[in-house]
Amino acid sequence: MATVSTSPLVFSVIIGVYDDWIPLDRCVRSLTQQTNAPSFEVIVVDDGSGDVAPEYIRNWTGVYQLTLIRQSHAGISAARNRGIQASRGLVLVFVDADCKFHPDCLATLAATINKSPQHNSFQLHLVGDCSGIVGRAEELRLVTLQNHLLQPDGCIRYLNTAGFAIRRARVDIEKGLFDPVAVRAEDTLLLASLIQGGELPLFVSKAIVQHAIPLSLLECFRKDFRVAQLDARTYDIIAARGVRFRVSQQQRLRMLLSMWKTAGQDSIGRLAWFVLAARQAPRLIVLFLRKVTP
């Protein structure tokens, strides 16, 4: 298996975007602040946004290797697959447009990949932006999931493409990595495929990506109700494959109690627990109804 080095091109950072130009600007700016990073390119796939990439995005092409691709609206899975086809790096790194890399993220990820030739996929450490209630609730969610789904061998039963990497050799470049059928929860469907293949991502705890949700609390609630059915359809696909990935009711209770304890920290606060519980409700209700309805 190839070892990551500083030559040739190491990382292809692939970002799908749909009208999220301002958050994307912060994301690509964070890549200019990387310290001791190996060589990388950035591929931004515009999934049919209402407006083409603004000038302040196009200007980044003069700072590092940035490729802008525009396609008709086909969904995030198709956008990422298009980015894969255009990529040249030994490792593909996926990140959401509303995320920011910590300064040593790529250097840490490269070092971990070099030391882990037995692993093909890597889950980066995701954190929230605790400057507002939406971000504190997201931090609480991420802390809980990453703590409870971490395995004794350092792998994690969790995959979130807000910060995920995979070796190029593991990917069918022409076919792509993501199933376009999954309009939502495409990363969970990918996790199911990895589990079927006997693999889990290695958790890279020191390669940190901040997920800075740009929506207001009301906008988040509206989105949660809107996408709950889409998430459930992907979970149906996973269930049809016979892959069990969801936690048991007992595990869910332990996670709720753990969240309550974590919410006692001053940096998060109890209100974040209630916000998170409310945001999870639409998805859980839809899943329950699909289970009990003939």
Predicted regions and their residues:
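Short aromatic/hydrophobic "clamp" motif used to bind/position activated sugar donors
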Residues: 92
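Glycine-rich, basic loop-to-helix element that forms the pyrophosphate-binding segment
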Residues: 71-87
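Conserved donor NDP-sugar-binding/catalytic core segment of glycosyltransferases
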Residues: 104-135
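Non-catalytic, C-terminal membrane-associated alpha-helical segments of glycosyltransferases
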Residues: 223-230, 241-294
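Short, flexible, basic/aromatic active-site loop/helix in glycosyltransferases
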Residues: 124-125, 138-157
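Short, well-formed alpha-helical segments that are part of the catalytic scaffolds
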Residues: 20-33
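A conserved acidic beta->alpha catalytic loop
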Residues: 30, 46-55, 99
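Acidic donor-binding loop at a coil-to-helix junction in glycosyltransferase catalytic cores
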Residues: 183-192
